Amino acid sequence: MASSVLNLFKSCRPFTPIRFSSLPKSQFRIQFPLRPGKETQLRRCFTTLSSLTDGGAPISGGKELWLHNTMSRKKELFKPKVEGKVGMYVCGVTAYDLSHIGHARVYVTFDVLLRYLKHLGYEVSYVRNFTDVDDKIIARAKELEEDPISLSRRFCEEFNRDMEQLQCLDPSVQPRVSDHIPQIIDLIKQILDNGYAYKVDGDIYFSVDKFPTYGKLSGRKLEDNRAGERVAVDTRKKHPADFALWKAAKEGEPFWESPWGRGRPGWHIECSAMSAAYLGYSFDIHGGGMDLVFPHHENEIAQSCAACDSSNISYWIHNGFVTVDSEKMSKSLGNFFTIRQVIDLYHPLALRLFLMGTHYRSPINYSDFLLESASERIFYIYQTLHDCESALGEKDSTFENGSVPSDTLTSINTFRTEFVASMSDDLLTPVTLAAMSEPLKTINDLIHTRKGKKQARREESLKALETTIRDVLTILGLMPTSYSEVLEQLKEKALKRAGLKEEDVLQRVQERTDARKNKEYERSDAIRKDLAKVGIALMDSPEGTTWRPAIPLALQEPVTTTP
């Protein structure tokens, strides 16, 4: 099974002393509704599982990781510049409003990469900045009659709350532009001294025609490029694509003193300065959304190389867009949903699963159906693990390798192999999530085993399977603090989406029970269907009727159109 999956998806120093120590090509799209963290947890993951193969030998895979490099336009074997250490910079948000789920996709993507690198044993210096000096921030501050820096700091805090909800690990450092003006000025000085920039009336522009390889990341030719700014083309520029490194102060805008007079940094120079400050000019991974390839990352490369000719980033990694009706979700288009809006109705871990259900480089279309599918799937996962926990009771979760039945070991090893194969192949999270179905099914089968040989060694199997899945969930950032708590939260969200309270559901359950006793089967079926339409599924058992969240029948029914 693992082989079929593989076949199918087959030296300058920084200018400021605050740095950290530091498969073959294929393209495809995966998107489908799936059915059924802590640092110490990440270090612990798979320490037990590595000995679960015949003879105690760990499953092959090691530290091999293939990542798609935007620069080379192909998958490459990951090799860090310094053995055992990884430097990673991801462009952060421009903080002037609540973040939308397009932002969530970026940072969940790189959180998965961060977690997997840690799982592989790397020491990761992860830098994710905040842009708190920008035209959009200034405009929003004027609109709200608020100080721009104060407004931005407020939304930086809101962003961090969103990331905590999505179980994204904290970066090693989160630098803000306003705290790094001296470093930015130093970098601009270096670029000017090296002859790659020019001054115009207090502004400093980068001269793109002085940089022969400009466009190598995006594949654009210089003559085809538009200005690399967020404002209209300035006729004072030598070339239309020249972009601002420093902007002269305007009345009512924040400014800082510089050798060129009062002003503020341009957009692109900020990330070049902060990445060099913490990671140096040469590091491993630079990431962000696909929309940053041009002009932002293209301009970063030009600036950094102009300041230091040995500047080099090994891997440029970009995630695909979240779309709404095939258009990119963005604040500027006004077609966005904030993270807060989504997690008001759906559990944050359901949103995380939704984002991981499509390969990170492919576009993902926002829809209620896919979010409902993710919510149903995550409920199934946690319910299965909760039932497993209940079946084991207070028993010690540790187990001896030799006590686990061979068929369980086979199931675990198959899943482990699929996990390594899919994650090492450019982070194929959809394949990993799909592969989880088999061990979950095995747990459910074992829980309902009451006699025979399986019952005799049931506990050892359940312990081993639960440990396996728990460790994978931890690496994926999907492990909750408590199965029971998150199940209750998922039910609360489902009730909110349905516009019901639990007592309403329980009353309908009782009405249905009475109808069945009276052999009013049509009424009984109608009650079940009414609840199913709004995402409440009823489950009958000898102990009575219970309910769980499900994809609303109204979303599952095909839409009919009249000619």
Curated annotation (Swiss-Prot):
Motif 'HIGH' region boundaries: 93-103
Localization annotation: Plastid, Chloroplast; Mitochondrion
Amino acids binding Zn(2+): 91, 271, 296, 300
One GO BP: regulation of programmed cell death
Binding site for L-cysteine: 92, 131, 296
Species this protein is from: Arabidopsis thaliana
Matching Pfam families: CysS_C, tRNA-synt_1e
Keywords: Aminoacyl-tRNA synthetase, ATP-binding, Chloroplast, Ligase, Metal-binding, Mitochondrion, Nucleotide-binding, Plastid, Protein biosynthesis, Transit peptide, Zinc
Residues in the signal sequence: none
Physiological role: Required for female gametophyte development. Is necessary for the fusion of central cell nuclei and programmed cell death (PCD) of the antipodals.
Gene3D superfamilies in alphabetical order: Cysteine-tRNA ligase, C-terminal anti-codon recognition domain, HUPs
This protein's name: Cysteine--tRNA ligase, chloroplastic/mitochondrial
CDD domains linked: CysRS_core
Reaction catalysis annotation: tRNA(Cys) + L-cysteine + ATP = L-cysteinyl-tRNA(Cys) + AMP + diphosphate
EC numbers for this chain: 6.1.1.16
Family: Belongs to the class-I aminoacyl-tRNA synthetase family.
UniProt cross-references to PANTHER family, sorted A to Z: CYSTEINE--TRNA LIGASE, CHLOROPLASTIC_MITOCHONDRIAL, CYSTEINYL-TRNA SYNTHETASE
